[in-house]
Amino acid sequence: MVLRSEILVNKNVMPTAEQALPGRETPMSLPEFHYVFKDTPLLGPFFEGSIDFAIFGLGCFWGAERRFWQREGVVSTVVGYAGGFTPNPTYEEVCSGLTGHTEVVLVVFDKDKVSYRELLAMFWELHNPTQGMRQGNDVGTQYRSAIYCTSPQQLEEAKASRDAFQAELNKAGYGEITTEIDQAPTVYFAEAYHQQYLAKNPDGYCGIGGTGVCLPPSLQGN
């Protein structure tokens, strides 16, 4: 049996539900509006376009969120924690390795302007999905690669794009993709200061970086 004290030393070990921190019932307080999109409610309601949601984990959520809010067709972004056990965790608890969560970006997008396949292409190309419980210099379960799908169609498209990107990675000499692909669990939103962090702190840390491998244009959903 792995003890909590041992997990604190080795953050590459996923805790069990019994080992995870208990968390709390109260969610984090969030600002009403998106810091970048100004008049757009952070969590809706969204009245324009054909709205859908995507959930991606690709390392530190500060840099990941910025890349997605810069994409045309994205109408809102929120960062949070998902895939673990602890309800409504704090950032410090997630960093301890004792929640099981990974850092994620909830992407709200207009399907008439950007497709899920296009967002998947961004996801694969923005980070290295072969690194297991780390992303670059950021090490731990909270930095693992993940796609959490909000519909059966998203799940099918995510797996198909993974297989296509794996073929391209193989050509470039990379290993196997370790990205977790599953139905969407509960996303616990991160503290207010994390939301749109790099818009508030332009010189802040951003550890996101891809492999240089790209999907063929025919598979990018353009």
From Swiss-Prot:
Catalytic-site annotation from UniProt: C60
One GO cellular component term: cytoplasm
Keyword Oxidoreductase: yes
Any Pfam family the entry gives: PMSR
UniProt key word Oxidoreductase: yes
Reactions catalysed according to its record: L-methionyl-[protein] + [thioredoxin]-disulfide + H2O = L-methionyl-(S)-S-oxide-[protein] + [thioredoxin]-dithiol; [thioredoxin]-disulfide + L-methionine + H2O = L-methionine (S)-S-oxide + [thioredoxin]-dithiol
E.C. number(s) listed in UniProt: 1.8.4.11
SUPFAM superfamilies to which the protein is assigned, alphabetical: Peptide methionine sulfoxide reductase (SSF55068)
GO MF terms held by the record: L-methionine-(S)-S-oxide reductase activity; peptide-methionine (S)-S-oxide reductase activity
One GO-annotated biological process of the protein: cellular response to oxidative stress
Record keywords: Oxidoreductase
Similarity comment: Belongs to the MsrA Met sulfoxide reductase family.
The protein, known as: Peptide methionine sulfoxide reductase MsrA
Organism whose genome encodes this protein: Pseudomonas putida (strain W619)
Gene name per UniProt: msrA
